[in-house]
């Protein structure tokens, strides 16, 4: 787990929080441009949370999550401000690429969710690990329920013995 796998959501949440802070004095369009400029000064040209090497032109997971955020905003569960920011960032990156659209990926969408729920950006990596841990636990349990030997160290009773002559 590093800055690309697991850390991208943290970096994206940092961007969204920076944009939200700028929005205290500027409108969303200006805030997004300034936020992206600040982010790129720190991290470089590629913006975490957007684009995917396999899911093109759309990461199919992101629109589903974003629709759930929009639904929660309609029901006053969350504000929807970070959903607006995420979608505006996506739009602005596309404009800056010569009107070439870019997909919000799963990290961009989960960063929206974490920000909407009030989690500080540094907790995003831990939340990513937590969700993966639940999946690993479920997979292990499923394998155990199938019966038979589960992959792992060989029991000592069936290890081959090597004797020198």
What are these language model-derived features?
Residues 1-165:
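Non-transmembrane, aqueous-exposed alpha-helical and coiled segments at domain scale
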């Amino acid at each position: 787990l590093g800055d690309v796998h697991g850390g991208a959501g943290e970096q994206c949440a940092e961007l969204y929080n920076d944009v939200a802070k700028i929005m205290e004095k500027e409108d969303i369009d200006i805030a997004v441009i300034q936020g992206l400029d600040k982010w790129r000064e720190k991290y470089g040209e590629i913006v975490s949370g957007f684009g995917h090497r396999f899911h093109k032109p759309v990461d199919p997971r992101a629109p589903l999550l974003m629709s759930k955020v929009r639904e929660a905003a309609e029901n006053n569960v969350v504000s929807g401000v970070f959903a607006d920011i995420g979608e505006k960032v996506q739009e602005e990156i596309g404009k800056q690429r010569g009107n070439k659209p870019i997909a919000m990926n799963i990290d961009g969408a989960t960063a929206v969710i974490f920000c909407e729920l009030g989690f500080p950006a540094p907790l995003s990596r831990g939340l990513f690990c937590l969700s993966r841990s639940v999946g690993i636990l479920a997979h292990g349990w499923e394998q155990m329920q199938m019966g038979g030997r589960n992959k792992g160290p060989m029991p000592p009773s069936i290890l081959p013995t090597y004797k020198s002559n």
